[in-house]
């Protein structure tokens, strides 16, 4: 089924604006996606019609809010193939979900000398929490080197894997190059050694249909804001036995059965990990975003994104002094380096022409160090981008190169 791109673009009010005298070309969707009107409306409708604290009180508004909130949890469970909504923990995003796993599961199970294997290609959110818990427990974070082309070092991983390894952490799809990592092979090998696997799905959830049971993933996390949903809402999926054995990491209301000065008993899943008032509007809007995204032909969306990436890559490859780091065909990301030019300068010149890209290290210092660069200009496509926008990008790059 072909995508009706005009109809899709019309649903995104942010794309209708003028930036620096030019129509906005938004090419930063790997950082955060723009939001369709239905998601914006879902937030507005909640606050104008159903605003109430969930799981508390007996009035109609709280009953309506709770129904929508828990309905959203059920929808997320179905979206990723989880066995139950009890396996879905609401968080502020993938970063908080990874920290929850580190401070609850890892801190309560790791011992001195244990190892946590982490890919060199990871976002800082999937490195720093493991370093912190390693310091707390005496465990050791071990780097899985990437290949020279920026791919997951599967051979190196197999050599590093040993009975000392208790946790393996890697992204489903990397955020700098768009590399799809071999999570199935990693999960299988890790499980054979008795290790659990944590998958950062912040990028992967957008581009693949995820079935956590088919993957046999122990933990899978993602953020709503990269999936056309609002910022501030995220998801932690965990296997039931793991979640049940994990201690709460935050204390407060909602996550308790009984509180007294003699001691406190905690509620079961998922509530014991959700202390305090949750982001009700964010959860409801995430469910709306999932509905919206599933209404599209996902295969057609990915084909469209790959076509845009290929169009851009072919044109950029012809430009002297610009190179693409770790190019991955059939992705939706390109990371560029211009010899002798700071990435921020190139991005600024593009912004002056209405082209929004990301410049920096993309929260991936180890990957940048491995490539021998300080940062890149990252171009990342969303469902709303067009071939005409790629043409504008290329023209803007040529103009920037002439100025630099």
Swiss-Prot record:
Protein name per the record: Probable cysteine desulfurase
EC code: 2.8.1.7
Keyword Cell wall biogenesis/degradation: no
Record-stated family: Belongs to the class-V pyridoxal-phosphate-dependent aminotransferase family. Csd subfamily.
The protein's required cofactors: pyridoxal 5'-phosphate
GO biological process: cysteine metabolic process; iron-sulfur cluster assembly
Record: active site: 363
UniProt cross-references to CDD domains, sorted A to Z: SufS_like (cd06453)
EC main group: transferase
Modified residues (N6-(pyridoxal phosphate)lysine): 226
Protein origin, superkingdom: Bacteria
Catalysed reactions, as listed in the record: (sulfur carrier)-H + L-cysteine = (sulfur carrier)-SH + L-alanine
Keywords: Pyridoxal phosphate, Transferase
Role played: Catalyzes the removal of elemental sulfur and selenium atoms from L-cysteine, L-cystine, L-selenocysteine, and L-selenocystine to produce L-alanine.
Transferase in keyword set: yes
InterPro entries per UniProt: Aminotrans_V_dom, Cys_desulphurase_CdsA, Cys_dSase_SufS, Cysteine_dSase, PyrdxlP-dep_Trfase, PyrdxlP-dep_Trfase_major, PyrdxlP-dep_Trfase_small
GO MF annotations in UniProt: cysteine desulfurase activity; pyridoxal phosphate binding
């Amino acid at each position: 089924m072909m995508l009706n791109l005009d109809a899709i673009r019309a649903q995104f009010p942010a794309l209708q604006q003028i930036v620096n005298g030019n129509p906005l070309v938004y090419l930063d969707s790997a950082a955060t996606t723009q939001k369709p009107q239905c998601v914006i409306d879902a937030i507005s409708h909640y606050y104008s019609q159903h605003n109430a604290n969930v799981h508390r009180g007996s009035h109609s508004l709280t009953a309506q809010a709770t129904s929508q909130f828990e309905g959203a949890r059920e929808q997320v469970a179905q979206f990723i193939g989880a066995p139950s909504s009890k396996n879905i923990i609401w968080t502020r995003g993938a970063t908080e979900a990874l920290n929850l796993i580190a401070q609850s599961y890892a801190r309560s199970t790791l011992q001195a000398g244990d190892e946590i294997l982490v890919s060199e290609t990871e976002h800082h959110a999937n490195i720093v929490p493991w370093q912190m818990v390693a310091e707390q427990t005496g465990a050791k974070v071990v780097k899985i080197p990437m290949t020279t082309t920026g791919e997951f070092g599967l051979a190196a991983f197999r050599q590093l894997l040993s009975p000392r390894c208790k946790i393996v952490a890697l992204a489903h799809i990397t955020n700098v190059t768009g590399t799809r990592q071999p999570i199935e092979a990693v999960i299988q090998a890790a499980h054979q050694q008795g290790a659990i696997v944590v998958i950062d799905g912040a990028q992967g959830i957008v581009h693949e249909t995820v079935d956590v049971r088919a993957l046999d993933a122990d933990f899978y996390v993602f953020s709503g804001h990269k999936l056309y949903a609002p910022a501030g809402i995220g998801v932690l999926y965990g296997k039931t036995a793991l979640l049940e054995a994990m201690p709460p990491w935050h204390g407060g209301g909602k996550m308790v059965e009984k509180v007294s000065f003699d001691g406190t008993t905690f509620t079961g899943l998922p509530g014991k990990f959700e202390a305090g008032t949750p982001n009700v509007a964010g959860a409801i809007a995430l469910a709306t975003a999932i509905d919206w995204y599933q209404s599209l032909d996902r295969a057609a969306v990915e084909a469209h994104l790959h076509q845009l990436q290929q169009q851009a890559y072919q044109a950029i490859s012809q430009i002297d002094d610009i190179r693409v780091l770790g190019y991955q065909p059939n992705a939706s990301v390109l990371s560029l380096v211009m010899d002798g030019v700071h990435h921020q300068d190139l991005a600024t010149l593009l912004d002056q022409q209405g082209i929004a890209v990301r410049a920096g290290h993309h929260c991936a210092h180890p990957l940048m160090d491995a490539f021998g660069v300080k940062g890149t200009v990252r171009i990342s496509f969303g469902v709303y981008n067009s071939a005409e926008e790629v043409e504008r990008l290329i023209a803007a790059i040529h103009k920037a190169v002439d100025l630099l």
